[in-house]
Curated annotation (Swiss-Prot):
The gene is HSPD1. The modification Phosphotyrosine is found at residue 227. Keywords: ATP-binding, Chaperone, Isomerase, Mitochondrion, Nucleotide-binding, Phosphoprotein, Transit peptide. It comes from Gallus gallus. The lineage of its organism: Eukaryota, Metazoa, Chordata, Craniata, Vertebrata. Belongs to the chaperonin (HSP60) family. One of its GO terms (cellular component) is cell surface. This is 60 kDa heat shock protein, mitochondrial.
Length: 573
């Protein structure tokens, strides 16, 4: 038997041999000051150049290679930004920081990513230049943030609320790159499901864009057996004024469903059974009665899985005024069902793939309470998947769901259009939330005079304010440049005109922006500026950058290739 010190002596050489592999990470490369900033700025420039070409009504598209499938054609700033990954680590850090600006703006406002990117580049570039001449980066950042606060207040003054469907259509049209059809379809969707209703975007099956409104509760589970079909046309099962039995558990025995069938039959009501599954004797009995006696019944599997299924079934019960059998904590058995336990609906449509419960007879107060619970969950959850599911449930309980089906001749065209529709939808929601300001970069130009009233604490803060003053001209200049005209001349002319006048890049003329429908959501403009200023001014304060030195991969040895010599002779000339 070994004593402990002897065991330790044996372990020590092994630990020494392993130590380099356990403790040694990649080597690091460090750059300081102007060298580091210059390389990062090159990355910022590369990303901003690629994104800036998409800006404005005459902006161009960008083609992105994908690891699978055909290349993606897009005019969406954040999609372009996300696709960029540079080989040089220092340049990539600059690009990634501006990428974060685009992502943050997209998450918060849903649009304005291109504006945020060109603003971030302008602030970072000017900031680097002033710092290299000896200005204090921390004070410059304070000046920048001081200016941003003043502009945010000014934008609120310029903002006007969105009141009419026409204004909603105008906002959507501008964000969809001037596509009026998209603008109108989004306006219609908002009219039908309410301004806070759920609107989803999907691939269409035709050449044209379509709007489908789903009222009531629709879920993606159809009839368990085709023998339940009761219409000659359309392969579906339709009932009016039906009872709904909702069970969390599987239904297999005949005895468990006989009481429900007897009650439904005595009340002369069709019966919809929604359960985890209906099989065995229970299913064969239902099918036989349906075929021989003409029993009005249909069985459907419950949607979703796990907690999501439980929540959806509870939602259905509340919307229809029924109870959930087999629910944990409640000793409700299907055999003991009473008339008041059934959910009640005005209309039911069940197809092979989905079920729709319309005109549920649930209590308004209970439905409102359930909606409030879901809203509270939405406020605290951080998971994107959870948010999506909660929003779907919310829509089914409230005004229904509007589905925008995007049409086109090919997948590439549909995907490009889908990006624009999503942008337009997000911009419209932002406009409804915080109002609108003149578009085309004009709102930021109109905020320049507000900066003259600021009183900086020192010269370096004044430099920060001046940086923002010059940066506010960049979006309008970029839009003009993409339209093929001299940006600085256009900006000067706008500044000399009255406050409502701006440049219509599509027609190449100066117009009243709001009257012409060239408008931006206030939230989008505000978020773009705040995100750009925050990240770009931080970027300017960087004095050292640390990156990993890539490990050199050794070429694999060409072992096992011996024995090839001499055997290839004879006639090989």
């Amino acid at each position: 038997m070994l004593r402990l010190p002897a065991v330790l002596r044996q372990i020590r050489p092994v630990s020494r041999a392993l130590a380099p592999h356990l403790t040694r990470a990649y080597a690091k490369d460090v750059k300081f000051g102007a060298d580091a900033r210059a390389l990062m700025l090159q990355g910022v420039d590369l990303l901003a150049d690629a994104v800036a070409v998409t800006m404005g009504p005459k902006g161009r598209t960008v083609i992105i290679e994908q690891s699978w499938g055909s290349p993606k054609v897009t005019k969406d700033g954040v999609t372009v930004a996300k696709a960029i990954d540079l080989k040089d680590k220092y340049k990539n850090i600059g690009a990634k920081l501006v990428q974060d600006v685009a992502n943050n703006t997209n998450e918060e406002a849903g649009d304005g990513t291109t504006t945020a990117t060109v603003l971030a580049r302008a602030i970072a570039k000017e900031g680097f230049e002033k710092i290299s001449k000896g200005a204090n980066p921390v004070e410059i950042r304070r000046g920048v943030m001081l200016a941003v606060d003043a502009i945010t207040a000014e934008l609120k003054k310029l903002s006007k609320p969105v009141t009419t469907p026409e204004e909603i259509a105008q906002v959507a049209t501008i964000s969809a790159n001037g596509d009026q059809e998209i603008g109108n379809i989004i306006s219609d969707a908002m009219k039908k499901v309410g301004r806070k209703g759920v609107i989803t975007v999907k691939d269409g099956k035709t050449l044209n864009d379509e709007l489908e409104i789903i009222e009531g509760m629709k879920f993606d589970r159809g009839y368990i057996s085709p023998y339940f079909i009761n219409t000659a046309k359309g392969q579906k099962c339709e009932f009016q004024d039906a009872y709904v039995l909702i069970s969390e558990k599987k239904i297999s025995s005949v005895q468990s469903i006989v009481p429900a069938l007897e009650i439904a039959n005595s009340h002369r009501k069709p019966l919809v059974i929604i359960a985890e599954d209906v099989d065995g004797e229970a299913l064969s009995t239902l099918v036989l009665n349906r075929l021989k006696v003409g029993l009005q019944v249909v069985a459907v599997k419950a949607p979703g899985f796990g907690d999501n299924r439980k929540n959806q079934l509870k939602d259905m019960a509340i919307a229809t005024g029924g109870a959930v059998f087999g629910e944990e904590g409640l000793s409700l058995n299907v055999e003991d069902i009473q008339p008041h336990d059934f959910g009640k609906v005005g209309e039911v449509i069940v197809t092979k793939d989905d079920t729709m419960l319309l005109k549920g007879k649930g209590e308004k107060a209970q439905i409102e309470k359930r909606i409030q619970e879901i809203i509270e969950q939405l406020e605290v959850t951080t998971s994107e998947y959870e948010k999506e599911k909660l929003n779907e449930r919310l829509a089914k309980l409230s005004d229904g769901v509007a589905v925008l089906k995007v049409g086109g001749t090919s997948d590439v065209e549909v995907n490009e259009k889908k990006d624009r529709v999503t942008d337009a939808l997000n911009a419209t929601r932002a406009a409804v939330e915080e109002g609108i300001v003149p578009g085309g970069g004009c709102a930021l130009l109109r905020c320049i005079p507000a900066l003259d009233a600021l009183k900086p604490a020192n010269e370096d803060q004044k430099i920060g304010i001046e940086i923002i003053k010059r940066t506010l001209k960049i979006p309008a200049m970029t839009i003009a440049k993409n339209a093929g005209v001299e940006g600085s001349l256009i900006v000067e002319k706008i500044l000399q005109s009255s406050s409502e006048v701006g440049y219509d890049a599509m027609l190449g003329e100066f117009v009243n922006m709001v009257e012409k429908g060239i408008i931006d959501p206030t939230k989008v403009v505000r978020t773009a500026l705040m995100d750009a200023a925050g990240v770009a001014s931080l970027l300017s304060t960087a004095e050292a950058v640390v990156t990993e030195v890539p490990k050199e991969e050794k070429e694999p040895a060409m072992g096992g290739m011996g024995g090839m010599g001499g055997g290839m002779g004879g006639g090989m000339f």
